[in-house]
Amino acid sequence: MSLVLDPAAQDLLFREARTANTFTDEPVTDEQVQAIYDLVKFGPTAFNQSPLRVVLVRSAEGRERLVQHMAEGNRPKTATAPLVAILAADNEFHEELPALLPHFPQAKDLFFSERPVRESAAGLNAALQAAYFIIGVRAAGLAAGPMTGYDAAGIQKEFLDDDHTPLMVVNIGKPGDDAWFPRSPRLSFDEVITTV
């Protein structure tokens, strides 16, 4: 069976896309980032929570502050990527629910009045949105280098607040020389899918 999405687009988004480890010097513009967001914001989340928040680290001072919280192996590529984004979950996302879920505004208090419930929901749904974000970066013809090797408490203190939990740091740009590691294997259909 063939998919509706053009094979070239399938390759761009999935089969040929890889995590980039080096980048060219070509800048990533605010217009590109807005185009990415304006596409991926339509990806589904439970109750339309939309808890993902993004901090773009553009300044040299901000980059220096960020690099010190990255794992040693992630520091050089984070220091040199054209753009770095900190993706975080907003644990107070429920405050936006009356606007985001106008047909069911009572969901804010009915389901999300307790902080632990919000943190769990925000983490799950922001991670889902982070995946959309990576696909959106690829759709813009750019490469993404998502990383979870960092001091989460340090990044939270430096760039966020107690209501925002860092999920990942993503380097963004045009891939540079030797950007890719060899493609790692994937599990087969039969290893993943069961039918009952």
Curated annotation (Swiss-Prot):
A Pfam cross-reference name: Nitroreductase
Cofactor entry: FMN
EC number: 1.-.-.-
GO molecular function: oxidoreductase activity
Source species, domain of life: Bacteria
Record keywords: Flavoprotein, FMN, NAD, NADP, Oxidoreductase
InterPro entries: Nitroreductase (IPR029479), Nitroreductase-like (IPR000415), Nitroreductase_HadB/RutE (IPR050461), RutE-like (IPR023936)
Class of the enzyme per the UniProt entry, highest EC level: oxidoreductase
Keyword Methyltransferase found: no
UniProt keyword annotation of Flavoprotein present: yes
Family: Belongs to the nitroreductase family. HadB/RutE subfamily.
Name of this chain's protein: Putative NADH dehydrogenase/NAD(P)H nitroreductase SGR_2476
